[in-house]
């Protein structure tokens, strides 16, 4: 239960990390993860083993320690519904995070640890990149060196994700094309005015004209509700589609994405003498920027 997305313990740990500010002296975390799916390990009963934006087990956005916290509160003065406004935006400490090429979570062929061998193989270049990335982490001795490595890892990750976006798989009878987009993870926790959990509610994302119908097609990859903390929802969003993607000839047309993002919360009961009012956060470009972070998780 602890590791389930949106668990109370996981939220507390992540919020504490985000609020921690500067790291202790001479402690520099590093994150290395692949985003390659080992098709031989795909489980037809568990589609998450082939989930985009992951290594087949862990999402890049989950592994990435670069995370943010956003709190919303009711804006005073509204009668028909509670207009929400941003109360707090906190970005966690900057962490060096690198997506390495051709690596999955496990397995002797593509596993990020098990597949690295001393002898030369067909994927020796990917092995060398993985080992070199680890050695570059070991060589860090100062804050300036760490900051430079953070910037280098960011640039290398961006280049790699562009390079690995389209995968032509020879493992199927007919040619199969997989598109590996970048993803963002947003974990929503809903409370009432007394900080009590809400278990019966609807949460809608909105775009221009404050409508959920103006969001781009295919923007939502996955949505999960925590089994124990029923007031917590995790949205897994396609960052490329949300921000606008370029054409992939023969695979996908160009789409403009959205320039604004907002949300609505409809809690139950919403009728009767004692009831909840709807809560709405007006869609805006600033909310889109705050909630949609490439390869990252945002707690809201």
Can you name each region flagged by the protein language model?
Residues 211-254:
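Tryptophan-paired
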Residues 160-179, 260-300:
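Extracellular beta-sheet/turn segments enriched in Thr/Pro/Gly and aliphatic residues
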Residues 25, 179-183:
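Short, surface-exposed loop/turn motifs at beta-strand boundaries within globular domains
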Residues 184-192:
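A short, amphipathic beta-strand motif
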Residues 1-169:
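Helical cap/lid subdomain of alpha/beta-hydrolase-fold lipid enzymes
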Residues 255-259:
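A glycine-anchored, Pro-Gly-centered beta-turn/N-cap motif
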Residues 34-37, 192-194, 266-270:
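Short, flexible beta-strand-to-coil junctions
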